[in-house]
Regions:
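Bacterial N-terminal signal peptides that target proteins for export
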Residues: 1-9
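Catalytic Zn2+-binding segment of zinc metalloproteases
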Residues: 144-159
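Bacterial N-terminal signal peptides
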Residues: 8-17
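N-terminal, motif-rich segments that launch catalysis or mediate targeting to/interaction with membranes
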Residues: 19-135, 139, 155-265, 269-312
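Intrinsically disordered, low-complexity segments
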Residues: 2, 17-18
């Protein structure tokens, strides 16, 4: 069966959409979040900046070996009704009573995972090891960053229901890869978060409010772009692959009024604030004095299992 160039491009773009926010963006977020921290805790994070940067994408890599991982990166709010989705109990145990755990897992559990990882990070800072702190700091940073992405709040996560396949990688990978060097990374100091679960829900809802604009602007840019102006064929390492043209990426970024930069900035502040808050709740320990010992797993997370999706 023959396929058109456009169909081929869409297929390749779908296969390329394999990492939330894009590895480049996640690593940038974690690195920049360190500079939001107060002087009493920043030395530890600065000493381990490279390690933390590399761990920023570990949660995405786990999706290929851990069947419980995928559902932690998103929540399909559209399957629950309309904004502000007041029919979803914000607390996990209440939500399980209404929808059952299997239903919640099938629709994504992102805000609850952020809250569980927060508790893990508090434990790690209080009585864990340096390894534990780095693991949970990286993981909670990854999840809260995913919560800042509009396409992580819908079942139409890659435009597959609106004839916009590939939009996920376009929004969260291609745009930051092309423009991150021009971004303003001054996002202020980390703030103490009283209620991490409420904080996670608020960010998810903020992201969902941007979903219509995310989809509609891509449609408009596509409509005014010539047929051969959206995709290009590239050759690298002897292999042919498709990619959005730099002109299309630029047009879409402009149409979004720098939405991607703003959500990345929000991610940086959120990551730093969660790290800082966990440190406060742990009693402001000297993290450099932590010893090495085996991590204690979070029992709640062990119980979670969900099939992988192509791109979360």
């Amino acid at each position: 069966m023959k396929i058109s160039v456009t169909q081929y491009c869409l297929l390749i773009l779908t296969l390329l959409a394999i990492s939330s926010w894009g590895f480049h963006a996640h690593k940038t977020i974690h690195t920049q979040a360190i500079f939001t921290l107060p002087i009493k805790m920043s030395p530890f994070f600065l000493d381990h900046a490279h390690d933390l940067k590399e761990r920023a994408v570990t949660a995405d890599k786990r999706r290929y070996t851990d069947t419980t991982e995928a559902c932690k990166h998103y929540i399909d709010l559209d399957l629950y009704g309309i904004y502000p989705f007041e029919n979803i109990p914000r607390k996990w145990f209440n939500a399980k009573e209404v929808y059952t755990k299997d239903t919640l897992k099938s629709r994504g559990i992102l805000p609850w995972v952020i809250n569980w990882e927060y508790k893990n990070l508090v434990w790690a800072m209080d009585s864990g090891s340096k390894e534990d702190v780095l693991k949970h700091a990286a993981d909670i940073g990854h999840y809260i960053s995913d919560a800042n992405v509009p396409l992580h709040t819908t079942s139409n996560y890659n435009g597959q229901h609106s004839n916009q396949k590939g939009i996920h990688a376009l929004w969260e990978s291609r745009i930051p890869e092309n423009y991150s060097e021009t971004y303003d990374y001054f996002v202020g100091k980390a703030q103490y978060i009283e209620d991490p679960l409420e904080f996670a829900w608020n960010i998810v809802l903020e992201s969902n409010l941007l979903l219509n604009e995310t989809l509609e602007q891509e449609k408009k840019v596509t409509e005014r772009t010539r047929k051969d102006g959206k995709y290009k064929m590239d050759v690298s390492n002897g292999k042919v692959h498709s990619e959005y043209t730099s002109e299309f990426i630029a047009e879409y970024n402009f149409a979004l009024s720098n939405m991607v930069e703003r959500r990345l900035q929000s991610s940086i502040n959120a990551v730093g604030s969660l790290w800082y808050s966990a440190w406060i709740d742990a009693g402001q320990p000297n993290l450099n004095l932590l010893k090495t010992k085996k991590e204690q797993p979070n029992k709640e997370l062990i119980l979670i299992s969900s099939p992988n999706r192509i791109h979360e």
